[in-house]
């Protein structure tokens, strides 16, 4: 039995984003074409004597989607003592989906590591409780999103060519960002 798993969590890039309306729950109705890109966070999950997360980034544990995903698994299965080593390469608060990608890959990894026998639909049901972007990372490639971003259709034609992503390290607090 394998007692550790190494995963790569890809970033995503919105090639298009159309905001159509705002729902009563403060989510927006959108149409978007999203592409997974070759920028990855690296995650190693290993059986341990307790649950712990180590990372090279300053992430508030209350906001950490890996921690929230673990809480959902704990409610269903009880203790699954696991050590998570996360190397962040996707910039925080950049809109590139790093946290959502990490959560999706953590759930996939835990499923395999602990033989939880969750199918893709089970994983997506858990993902829905974590955030609208999480389930996008169960269907890599190019996807069309609609609704709150939770209605996902794969696009079979993948754009050819390259992309260069520029990122300014200036972080906007979530409270300020949400105000706009």
Can you say where each PLM-predicted feature lies in the sequence?
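DPxDG-like acidic metal-binding loop motif
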Residues: 94-122, 136
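Active-site catalytic microenvironments for nucleophilic, acid-base chemistry
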Residues: 72, 76, 109-116, 129
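ATP-dependent small-molecule kinase catalytic core of the GHMP/sugar-kinase superfamily
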Residues: 3-33, 116-180
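N-terminal beta-alpha supersecondary unit
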Residues: 3-80, 93
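Gly/Ser/Thr-rich beta-alpha loop segments that engage phosphate groups in nucleotides
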Residues: 66, 95-101, 133, 149-151
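Membrane-embedded alpha-helical segments that form the functional core of polytopic membrane enzymes
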Residues: 84-92
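Generic beta-strand or strand-like secondary-structure segments
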Residues: 65-72, 102-105, 109, 126
């Amino acid at each position: 039995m394998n007692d550790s798993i190494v995963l790569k969590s890809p970033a995503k890039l919105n090639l298009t984003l159309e905001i159509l309306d705002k729902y009563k729950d403060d989510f927006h109705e959108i149409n978007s074409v999203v592409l997974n890109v070759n920028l990855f966070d690296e995650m190693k999950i290993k059986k341990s004597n307790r649950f712990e997360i180590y990372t090279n980034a300053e992430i508030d544990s209350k906001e950490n989607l890996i921690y929230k995903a673990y809480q959902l698994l704990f409610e269903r299965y009880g203790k699954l003592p696991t050590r998570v080593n996360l190397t962040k390469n996707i910039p925080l608060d950049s809109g590139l989906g790093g946290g959502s990608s990490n959560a999706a890959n953590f759930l996939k990894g835990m499923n395999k590591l602990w033989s939880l026998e969750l199918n893709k639909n089970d994983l997506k049901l858990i993902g829905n409780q974590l955030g609208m972007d999480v389930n996008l990372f169960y269907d890599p490639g190019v996807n069309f999103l609609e609704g709150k971003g939770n209605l996902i259709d794969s696009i079979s034609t993948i754009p050819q060519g390259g992309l260069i992503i520029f990122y300014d390290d200036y972080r906007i607090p979530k409270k300020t960002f949400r105000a706009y």
